Design a protein with these regions (language model features):
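Eukaryotic scaffold repeat domains enriched in small/polar residues
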Residues: 1-276
Length: 276
C-alpha cells in the first residue's frame, strides 16, 4: 500500500501494516502535482510541469528499482476507434484544454490533453495520452446514448459542446478504477450547465456522487450528493479516495480529520487496530 506523505514521496506498507520503504517520484520542482496509479509493480502517473504552465507530462516508475521514464509507452486502447473529437477552449473548471471524443462503439471519453488515460483489458494496462475522464453508459444510470457533439456557443473563455440530446444532467465520471469485477467511480451531474461552470461548479445543479458498477451482474449502485463511500459499520469514517495496490487489492484511503473524528466517537475497545 502506498500512502502519500508529500507531493513526491510515498510510504510503502504491506497489508500487515509493516513499513517497507519510501518511494520517491519525480521531484516537486519538476511536477507541481501528480496523479498516480499503482499496478503490476509499477507506478504510472502524470503531473503539471511548473516551467511550462499547464502542460502535463506522463511518466512510468518501475518498482522497487526506481527506474523512471519521462513518458509512458503509447499503446492503442483495446477495441476503441475514435469517430470524432470536440474541443472546449479555456475550460478552467476542467483544468485547461478539454476534449470530448466519440468512439465508434457509441461510448464517449473526455479529458485534458496529455493527461494520461489508463484502461485495463486483456490482462494488460493500456495508456492513451489524450483523454482521461470517461462518460460511461451503464444500466441503472438511465443515460441516453450520446449521438453527436456540436458547438452550442461561447461565454467568456468558455466554449460549450453538447450532444444532440443535450448533455445536461448526464453523469461525468472523473475518477474510475476497477479490480476486474467491479468499477469504483466518482461522478458529477450537471457539469455541462453553463451557469455551473462559470460559478466554479459550486451551484446546487452540480451534484457529486460515487458508485460501484458490478461488471458480472451489470448492477449499478449510485450514492448521490456524497463523494464518500459509506462504511457499513456505524461510526466508522467513509472512504473518500480509492485506489488499487500493485497486486490488485482495493484500498480505501480516508481523510485525516475523519479518522480523528472516528477515534473520538468510537470507544477504544471497539476500534479496529488500524484505526488506533
Amino acid at each position: 500500500i502506498y500512502i502519500r506523505a508529500a507531493p513526491s514521496h510515498y510510504l510503502c506498507y504491506d497489508f500487515e501494516g509493516k513499513f517497507l520503504h519510501t518511494l520517491t517520484l519525480p521531484g516537486e520542482r519538476t511536477f507541481l502535482m501528480g496523479a498516480h496509479y499503482f499496478a503490476n509493480n509499477k507506478a504510472y502517473g502524470y503531473g503539471n510541469i511548473l516551467n511550462e504552465g499547464a502542460t502535463n507530462q506522463a511518466y512510468a516508475y518501475r518498482l522497487p528499482k526506481g527506474i523512471c521514464t519521462d513518458s509512458l509507452t503509447l499503446t492503442e486502447p483495446a477495441s476503441k476507434k475514435i469517430k470524432g473529437v470536440a474541443r472546449m477552449r479555456g475550460a478552467e473548471a476542467y483544468g485547461g484544454s478539454f476534449f470530448m471524443v466519440e468512439h465508434e462503439d457509441g461510448t464517449w471519453t473526455a479529458g485534458n490533453r496529455m493527461n494520461g488515460t489508463y484502461q485495463s483489458a486483456n490482462g494488460k494496462l493500456y495508456h492513451k495520452d489524450l483523454f482521461c475522464d470517461t462518460l460511461y453508459q451503464m444500466k441503472g444510470l438511465h443515460r441516453e446514448k450520446a449521438i453527436a457533439a456540436f458547438h452550442l456557443g461561447s461565454y467568456g473563455d468558455y466554449e460549450r459542446y453538447e450532444t444532440v440530446r443535450n448533455m445536461e444532467g448526464k453523469y461525468l465520471l472523473p475518477r474510475v478504477l476497477h479490480d476486474g469485477e467491479r468499477i469504483y467511480f466518482t461522478l458529477f451531474t450537471g457539469m455541462y450547465n453553463m451557469q455551473s461552470l462559470t460559478k466554479k461548479l459550486q451551484t446546487k445543479s452540480v451534484r457529486p456522487g460515487c458508485g460501484i458498477y458490478n461488471l458480472r451482474t451489470d448492477e449499478v449502485k449510485v450514492q448521490k450528493d456524497d463523494i464518500y463511500f459509506k462504511h457499513p459499520e456505524e461510526g466508522m469514517p467513509n472512504a473518500c479516495v480509492y485506489t488499487l495496490s500493485t497486486d490488485g487489492h482495493w484500498v480505501a484511503v480516508y481523510q485525516a480529520e475523519r479518522l480523528v473524528e472516528a477515534r473520538e466517537n468510537i470507544p477504544t475497545e471497539k476500534q479496529p487496530e488500524w484505526l488506533k
